[in-house]
Curated annotation (Swiss-Prot):
Organism of origin: Arabidopsis thaliana
Function comment: Pump for glutathione S-conjugates.
Protein name from the UniProt record: ABC transporter C family member 7
Annotated catalysed reactions: ATP + H2O + xenobioticSide 1 = ADP + phosphate + xenobioticSide 2
Organism classification: Eukaryota, Viridiplantae, Streptophyta, Embryophyta, Tracheophyta
UniProt entry tagged with the keyword ATP-binding: yes
Amino acid sequence: MKQSYAMDNPIVFFLLESNYFPMFSIFFNLLLLLVMFGSCVYKKRLGWENSDAFTNERFKDMSLTYNKLVVICCETLSALNSVLLLLSCFNLHKNGWDRSELMILLDLLFTALSWGAISFYIRSQFTYSHDQKFPILLRVWWVLYFMFSCYRLLVDIALYKKQELVSVHLLLSDVLAVSVGLFLCYSCLQKQGQGERINLLLEEPLLNGAESSAATSVQLDKAEDDEVVTPFSNAGFLSHVSFSWMSPLIVLGNEKIIDSEDVPQVDNSDRAEKLFWIFRSKLEWDDGERRITTYKLIKALFFSVWRDILLSTLFAFVYTVSCYVAPYLMDTFVQYLNGQRQYSNQGVVLVTTFFVAKLVECQARRNWYFRLQKAGIGMRSVLVSMIYEKGLTLPCYSKQGHTSGEIINLMTVDAERISAFSWYMHDPWILVLQISLALLILYRSLGLGSIAAFAATFLVMLGNIPLAKLEEKFQGNLMESKDNRMKKTSEALLNMRILKLQGWEMKFLHKILDLRGIEAGWLKKFVYNSAAISSVLWAAPSFVSATAFGACMLLKIPLESGKIIAALATFRILQTPIYKLPDTISMIVQTKVSLDRIATFLCLDDLQQDGMERLPSGSSKMDVEVSNGAFSWDDSSPIPTLKDIRFKIPHGMNIAICGTVGSGKSSLLSSILGEVPKISGNLKVCGRKAYIAQSPWIQSGKVEENILFGKPMQREWYQRVLEACSLNKDLEVFPFRDQTVIGERGINLSGGQKQRIQIARALYQDADIYLFDDPFSAVDAHTGSHLFKEVLLGLLRNKTVIYVTHQLEFLPEADLILVMKDGRITQAGKYNEILESGTDFMELVGAHTDALAAVDSYEKGSASAQSTTSKESKVSNDEEKQEEDLPSPKGQLVQEEEREKGKVGFTVYQKYMKLAYGGALVPIILVVQILFQVLNIGSNYWMAWVTPVSKDVKPLVSGSTLILVYVFLATASSFCILVRAMLSAMTGFKIATELFNQMHFRIFRASMSFFDATPIGRILNRASTDQSAVDLRLPSQFSNLAIAAVNILGIIGVMGQVAWQVLIVFIPVIAACTWYRQYYISAARELARLSGISRSPLVQHFSETLSGITTIRSFDQEPRFRTDIMRLNDCYSRLRFHAISAMEWLCFRLDLLSTVAFALSLVILVSVPEGVINPSFAGLAVTYALNLNSLQATLIWTLCDLENKMISVERMLQYIDIPSEPSLVIESTRPEKSWPCRGEITICNLQVRYGPHLPMVLRGLTCTFRGGLKTGIVGRTGCGKSTLIQTLFRIVEPAAGEIRIDGINILTIGLHDLRSRLSIIPQEPTMFEGTVRSNLDPLEEYADDQIWEALDKCQLGDEIRKKELKLDSPVSENGQNWSVGQRQLVCLGRVLLKRSKVLILDEATASVDTATDTLIQETLRQHFSGCTVITIAHRISSVIDSDMVLLLDQGLIEEHDSPARLLEDKSSSFSKLVAEYTASSDSRFKRSSMKTN
């Protein structure tokens, strides 16, 4: 009967008839021989007869094992078939001949000839190189040969069982052919060559021509000079689908620790710049409005990466369809096992169909995920580029509403989240497709019961709508609170030095912790809501199946085990997208929030483009022309910042701007730069501009890079600039001269050095117009005079120069002076003209004259007032010489980011787990998950056991009992899921909170040397990206790991219970999977680490750009900075791309192994004699096995991804382990509350360096500052003045020596006790975002009356009273809505409130005019008369009335005495310094000043 059925079915007969195999084999072998013969003839005609020697020589030099093994395999197969041919001839000669056996002999003959010809062809014609693959036709032949050999082996096994095989040698030949074919397939998928350099050519056809070879040679030569691009861009089809192009990098990762240089660049089509311009071209604007909506953002993102999205759509569709092949055939499979066979060899056909479907599913899923992640990388790249581009065009007044921390958050968190959404992009429509396919299969199995299944599914999805809305609300609030925290964190880190000097760091830490508390509140709601959604959807399959089976019972639809198992298989496949639904909903919500936030940011107004008319150099006689100009930082303010501005500046003029603090001087320069919005009037600027900001902006990088600022090196001009800016002497002190790396914001430079470097930067640009904003305030008098003479009057004598200054001695040389007051130009003219024409300038000159008179009086006065020189001030020449001879280690201050190597240690996991209740919940979570799996399997076993196999078998239990037991088991398993989800959420939340608190506490307790050596971007990276991973990603990854591991164990248990032989299959497969994981993880781990590290430069560059945007725009350097961000973007993208490619390389191989294991398990099941196993249980086992490859790949993928994500924990733990400063409070040595009462400071042999690898800055200071006296510290820029002050506050710990205040060694008391008892006005005035009140009294210790009193004393009272909100008037980030001088006065107000016994002024009045300086000095004399005041100043008038003067030179005390005594000695350095200062005020200034008197 079976034979007749086969004859009636021609397809089955055709497949099973062995005589057709030799015929097909002969045909294809003949075809191959003809093609190869044609190839040889064609090449011979082209003159390739003499190529044998060349190719053979190349072959001898081959170092690639694959190539040699391929030739050996071909030769072996040829020899084997020849031997088999002889043996078969001998056997047939002995036993007799027939037609079918003759066909086998011909097949062996032509097979031997084909393999011999291939071997000869490869040796003689195919040129091996490190870039080529085997010809495409040859590789296709090998793949077909492998498939043909596999099927032939199956048929010969069947014939052997029937004892119809001609010879057992043929069976052995088939086994060898399959093995060799598998190796050849693997070889043809490999890139040929070590190093895996980019293949610039399309794959060569089998017929190579001379022209193509010549082109190959030329292109390969060119490739040597090109950038190494990812092999993906030129990989062949089979290499693409198998990810074999990643193999060389994986191999390299096992041979060495991969560095960034080992990873190739992304393809040109995936570069940030190309994607960015595509994105920009697709981003449409509304008519008349540059408004970006979320829809337009999505549309532009789609068109940026449309190719990958469409390909992933195709693969997702193929995957979804292939998933449902097995459930569709499951009922047939169970019936087959029950003995109901429709045709002979039905089992082989079923197994083959299952196997092919799983192969297609495996291939489609891997390419689907890969393409989606590739698209995600591209989307992140364009979003980062777009946010950066917006930052380049954002005006200062817009940025005040969006701090740097918020903008960086958009880049680090929101852009990354949108990138991560690529995983879930297709899930919504796939879910619809899967439900549709599932309903078709269910209708086939359950009839009308499928409608109930659909209704239950719809009900589950409907029930998630309110939870999804809650999730969207929680997510939006979570991101908003994260922004607020990051804003405060960024501000605190940027100003950490002032926080530590004032003893405020713990107060700011508590503010950040409070903000984190708000964020944690929303995070807690978010994770628990997600846990609830997860519980509902994990319980959904059981609910849907119970509903469907219950409906069948009510509708009297008979339930057979085959149909039940088919339905369960469908539910299990449908379970995956339903399980993913909570994550999908969550990601959709999070992505929408992020898209809305980015769209809102991109909708901010750009810098006003029509406010200034830009003219090319030399096109106008006037370089700057303003007529009836009105400008305002806030265009909504009724009172403009600047009004009635009129002036014309011809080329080559020297313009000075002066005025009191807050009069609008800096705003006027900003208006010329186009930074202040124009309200009315006209502004024309002709030529290129260069700008020197009042607060120096220095990039992290080498000194040379800061000066060149993107221009090519012109050595002669470069040296002239260094000389004019007095930088040569500083460079000699730097460990690597101009190659020394400057820390972020120039943190390892003095204020004067930063100022001179940015002046050098401006000079080197050779611009037409130079704008200097108070450039001489941060340098000493001698250096200031030198800069004015060499720069403004020297190199720039033929340039247009506009400079703001408070040093009026630089005014007489100006061609035009503009005097400003209250935002108006009140006077304009030459020095002598305006001196006689108004009172505003007279007030400034009068104050300066008084200061000069005070200096003169000290020069001419006697030394009777204070002439005693302390013995402590004497430092012997021998000691100085001895200190100078001490070797000082030299090295860069800024260190490379820490990078762990090797696998993530077990201690990292241990520490992570113990952060939540000592790890007590982890075993409970595992037990609950195991219990869920047991109950879930039990419920399915129950259905398979009690339902009959066919209609003629009586059910074991009644329908109601069947459903009730199933519902009970399903409910119990659902409850376990709820418990597991809640416990996981609780654990993850606790760990995230503990990690955050510990890391931030250690960061804020770290010494300043940590912040000096660590760019802020690195810290922010951990506080944002790594913290987000710990908050949300890691808990779900650990849950997924537990779920996958327990599920796999359950599947193995189910299959092993049905047929124990299956366990034999799993042992080698699991071993192979484990080996692959170990082989993969070495490269993947380093790629993940490099990817994490590469984010920090991106964040750092972004942060630096935002802080220096005015300087960047003034130099027209936006294109260069845009190029830099694109380069950094590509650096991150290439590392991330190869990291996800490595993951897919692994997953493809694991899926392949799982598919083979699945197929072998099916072979075992169909091979077991009928009646040995229960068909229902066997079908159930297959149902579970359908998810085996998915679960196994998920397990390994989760393990690998978990290790990659644990790098975030590893990076945070690095900061938890950083050394802390000494204790804030030492109870045993706490000083009295009245300490210090006298304020006497004694310094003994003080030696200071900024790090063990850096040279000494202070080299053995010994002196005493008498209590109640005022001491001025002077010296050339970089001599160690500010370092001495930092040591006094223990910002820098002494390397040797000691400091005593009122007899107490400051090294023995707590830092808080020390710093809170001292007061300082720092060199760089700092204000924090908040209000006037919070800036003056951040600790909330004083009443409003006291604050107003302090404001009046520091000359800000009237200014604050004019503001509507008074003390609650807003202060923007870094006090950007206040002038630098006003910020300095606020710092003065702080110390007036604090009233400490010891006050340090570190260039406190550098940014104010002379009149304000005089008022400040009078205020200090009046309110700190009994205090010890130490003043560092470049203005001699600020220290000339001091009781003592300390002069430092190169870290040593040169002089220490009273000013009068030092001035008596005309040879003293101080006397010379005073003489230089007074001489810098021109005699014209003095004469003109006297006229006014």
